[in-house]
Amino acid sequence: MEMALQKQEQILCKALHTDLGKSKTEMMCEIGLVQGEIRWMKQHLGRLCRTKHVRTPLAQFAAKSYQSPSPYGNVLIMSPWNYPVLLTLEPLVDAIAAGNTAVVKPSAYAPASANVLKDLLEECFPPEYVAVVLGGREENQALLQEKFDKIFFHRKCSGRKAGHGKCCKTSDARDTGTWRKKPMHCRKKQ
């Protein structure tokens, strides 16, 4: 994905300028943050996936306890219009690194960026690992009717209220308003 992102950087910049009128500096910052996330994940993935020794409860004093990270499963990423590249690709990098499959729904309010992202992701990943859905509110509603193990959406996302309601009803894990919580690190409370 890192090489494909570098290869399509100019096309992405044109799309960001077409959709949002972003300056070259702002575009490079958005793309650079994604490239930085990819490099960071490549460096630290081994440590993040390692089995960790944890405290054993007193009742099982003779045993040893470990915690092993495991993927959630299928992740839905609904990105907003204001940072279409960053808030689509950064959670995707984390979801893929964690071993999840993903359905990516770029914003309909940034159509040029959404089309470039679709081409980029289809070039990088087979459709059984990463699927891209283009469209508006109808597609958002249809996606939210499906079962996902993790849903990422942002406050600026048009499907925010519906997505938040869906997450609360089904107890899906969710990230809203921040991309600091990664699909690999967050756990649902039992």
What spans do the regions from the language model cover?
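N-terminal Rossmann-like NAD(P)+-binding subdomain of aldehyde/semialdehyde dehydrogenases
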Residues: M1-Y66
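Alpha-helical structural signal in soluble globular domains
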Residues: E2-A4, A15, Q35-K42, L120-C124, ...
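Short alpha-helical
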Residues: K7, I11, K22, L33, ...
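Residue-level recognition of specific faces of alpha-helices
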Residues: E30, E37, N74-I77, R174
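Short secondary-structure transition/capping segments
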Residues: E37, N115-L117, R187-K189
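Conserved NAD(P)+-binding/catalytic subdomain of aldehyde/semialdehyde dehydrogenases
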Residues: N74, C124-Q190
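Conserved small-residue-rich beta-alpha loop and adjacent elements
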Residues: T56-E128, S171
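Short loop or secondary-structure boundary microenvironments that flank
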Residues: M28-I31, W81, P106-A108, L134, ...
